[in-house]
C-alpha cells in the first residue's frame, strides 16, 4: 500500500488554485536534472511542456524554510519544474492533472537519456516548437486532458492489479 503524505510546505510553494504537488527522484529525472542544458527539445513529449517548464538550482537538503520562497519564485506560473541535481516536480489543479504532467515530464526525461546514448541528437526546430506551444494553449483552454485520461488509467489499473486499493 502507498501512503499519501501531505507536504507541510506545499501551500507556501503553490498558488491557491493548485491542489497537488508531485515530486520524484527517478533515474531519468535526476539524470536530466544533472545536465547543464536541462530538458532538450528533442521529442514530441518534451515539446509539449517546454513552455511551462521551470528550473530551480540545487541548494542542498531541503530543510531550510527560506528555500520555499525561492522555489515558489522559480516555479512562477509553470506546472513543470526540474530541480537541478535533484529531481522533478509537477503541480496541478487536481491529482490527475499533476500526475499526467509528471508522466509527460518523466517520459521526456527517459526519451532524452535514451536518445543521448545513441548520440547525434536531432532537435525539434524552433518554428515547430512554436506551433506546438500554440496548439497546447488552445487545448488547455478547452479543459484538462487529465480529467479525461485519469478514469481510463484507473480502469487499466483495475484490470492489471485488482485489489490495489484495498
What do the PLM-derived regions correspond to, one by one?
Residues 10-166:
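Glycine-rich flexible loops
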Residues 1-13:
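Single conserved hydrophobic/aromatic residue that forms the stacking wall/gate
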Amino acid at each position: 500500500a502507498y501512503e499519501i503524505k501531505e507536504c507541510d510546505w506545499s501551500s507556501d510553494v503553490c498558488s491557491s488554485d493548485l491542489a497537488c504537488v508531485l515530486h520524484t527522484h527517478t533515474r531519468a529525472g535526476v539524470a536530466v536534472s544533472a545536465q547543464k542544458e536541462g530538458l532538450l527539445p528533442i521529442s514530441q513529449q518534451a515539446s509539449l511542456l517546454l513552455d511551462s517548464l521551470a528550473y530551480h538550482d540545487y541548494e542542498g537538503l531541503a530543510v531550510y524554510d527560506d528555500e520555499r520562497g525561492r522555489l515558489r519564485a522559480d516555479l512562477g506560473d509553470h506546472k513543470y519544474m526540474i530541480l537541478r541535481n535533484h529531481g522533478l516536480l509537477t503541480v496541478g489543479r487536481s491529482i490527475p492533472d499533476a500526475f499526467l504532467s509528471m508522466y509527460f515530464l518523466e517520459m521526456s526525461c527517459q526519451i532524452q537519456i535514451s536518445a543521448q546514448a545513441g548520440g547525434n541528437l536531432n532537435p525539434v526546430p524552433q518554428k515547430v516548437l512554436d506551433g506546438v506551444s500554440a496548439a497546447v494553449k488552445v487545448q488547455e483552454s478547452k479543459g484538462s486532458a487529465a480529467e479525461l485520461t485519469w478514469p481510463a488509467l484507473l480502469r487499466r489499473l483495475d484490470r492489471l492489479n485488482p485489489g490495489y486499493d484495498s
